[in-house]
């Protein structure tokens, strides 16, 4: 029987493999003071609500240009959520591009999205260039990918943190593509550009 399609290579790492704590990793991110402050607030908010038996949705949207630290921060978030037992896994981090979620034939896209999400259950699914899911009249199966992704975000809201990332304007356009995103994305984080001094020491994506 065999699979109907081949998913493009997916980066999957265990973010707990480092001997350092997640909080130490967070503090070592250079040039991201405002972002680190936001992550601490998110961690406190989620931990407090979990203690009260009101586990919030963990899904996020990262806005910013390439090289502003989005991937690095997403990895740290995965490790934080694992160490704090917010997510049930071991800090697994799966990274894909938005275009990787769209298949070429009818009915395959939903299965593809489901399989990718399944690989990240218990950890973080980081979807870079998520705005490539905007159909723009191309006649593909982008809408099917979005509909399936939104359903997966709801069905596994306590088991996974899905992070959508990309350029600010394009990401805002994506979120308007389907109103279901708004109720499922709990946290929005802006990643500013850096001057030449900060860029020389920043840990790039």
Indicate residue ranges for each PLM-predicted region:
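N-terminal accessory segments that target, anchor, or regulate ATP-driven/P-loop NTPase machines
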Residues: 1-17, 157, 161, 168-169, ...
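Conserved AAA+/SF3 P-loop NTPase catalytic/coupling segment centered on the Walker-B
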Residues: 121-150, 156-163, 170-176, 196-200
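Pre-Walker A (pre-P-loop) alpha-helix and adjacent loop at the N terminus of AAA/AAA+ ATPase modules
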Residues: 21-60, 79
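Flexible beta-alpha connector loops of hexameric P-loop NTPases
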Residues: 98-109, 132-143, 189-190
């Amino acid at each position: 029987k065999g699979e109907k399609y081949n998913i493009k290579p997916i980066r999957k790492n265990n973010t707990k493999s480092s001997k350092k704590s997640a909080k130490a990793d967070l503090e070592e991110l250079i040039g991201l003071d405002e972002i680190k402050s936001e992550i601490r607030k998110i961690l406190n908010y989620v931990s407090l609500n979990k203690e009260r038996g009101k586990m919030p949705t963990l899904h996020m949207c990262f806005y910013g240009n390439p090289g502003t630290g989005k991937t690095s921060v997403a990895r740290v978030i995965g490790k934080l959520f694992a160490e704090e037992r917010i997510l049930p896994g071991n800090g697994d981090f799966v990274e894909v591009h938005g275009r990787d979620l769209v298949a070429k034939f009818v009915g395959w896209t939903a299965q593809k999205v489901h399989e990718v999400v399944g690989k990240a259950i218990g950890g973080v699914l980081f979807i870079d260039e998520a705005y490539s899911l905007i159909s723009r009249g191309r006649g593909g199966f982008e809408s099917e990918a979005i509909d399936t992704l939104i359903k997966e975000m709801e069905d596994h809201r306590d088991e996974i943190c899905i992070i959508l990332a990309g350029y600010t304007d394009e990401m805002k356009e994506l979120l308007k593509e389907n109103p279901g995103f708004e109720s499922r994305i709990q946290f929005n984080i802006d990643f500013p550009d850096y001057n030449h001094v900060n860029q020389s020491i920043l840990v790039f994506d």
